Amino acid sequence: MILHYAQSWEDTHLLKQIIGKHPAQYHHMIASGGDHAFSLVKFGVEHINLVDSEVIQLEHIQSKIKALEHPKREILFGINDVNNGLLHSGRLEKYLRKFSAILPLLLRPGARNSIIDCISKEERVRIIKEKWETKRLRLVSSLFFSKKNINDIRHPGLSSDISKSPSGVNYLENFKLKALQYPIKENPYLDYIIHGYHKNSSLDYLKKSWAPKTSSLTLIHQDFFSYVKKLKTAIHFIHASDIMEGTSSKFNDRLFQAVDEVSESNSTFLYWEHRYEINVPESFKKKWVQINMNVI
């Protein structure tokens, strides 16, 4: 089974639904910032291998694990601090905080508070139409989240190959779509974009003083392709995140093949198709079934 979805960050609600419907024997993920893995372990996944070619990413996750067990975890994560903490140290987060700082100038008065207080979808539709539909927001967001700027703030390894066709993602329209779909209090990622920190929400793994068991996460310093190639055949859950956006089509074909070779029936392969279109080999399409995102 294959899945791709266009999100800038991990959509943990979606991942939980997928794992709940399509259980696997083994779980493997690009390490990234670790937030997605923490959420899934808290959700009930017993063990996840987190793989990354960058030592700094693995060290960042280790720091988060230690912070989760610390009595001053809120300070270490920067839960109520827009400038300091483990939640704010990424390149993307720093860029989003710049946008959140100027956002009030682009909206009609009271726009941010109004959308936060909305409970029903009907209310959010009305508020976005009345207070968020401004020429200033459309202009500045198109410049701020231009293809060039997004490529510049991504990790260098994720923008090394830009020969693929751009996906034409419209960040503002995606933002509105997600704002309409869920209340801000239930969507920490939109809350972060609006305020520069989780002002009205919280990441699920940061609730109720939770910390992962020592045995639940294994951090592996290795490139993802080499790692996948060495897996034993089984029912796998393999999450490649957005690494294929920064690699050539030829390399991506090899990764698809490697995933296919180690995966038994009912395995799941996930990847982001965010900034660039990822071409799936015909041989892969014949063996795998694409998940219909509308029925997850």
Q: Predicted segment positions?
A:
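Conserved acidic E/D residue at the C-terminus of a beta-strand in Rossmann-like folds
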Residues: L50-V55
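S-adenosyl-L-methionine
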Residues: M1-P23, F144
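A short acidic, Gly/Pro-enriched loop at the edge of an enzyme's catalytic core
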Residues: A24, Q222-H239
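Conserved beta-strand signature within the Rossmann-like core of class I S-adenosyl-L-methionine
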Residues: H239, S265-E277
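Conserved class I S-adenosyl-L-methionine
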Residues: P23-G34, I48-N49
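A short glycine-rich, Lys/Arg-flanked "PGG" loop and its adjoining helix->strand segment in the class I
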Residues: F251-S267
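C-terminal region signature
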Residues: Q17-I18, W272-I296
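Class I S-adenosyl-L-methionine-dependent methyltransferase module
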Residues: I56-W210
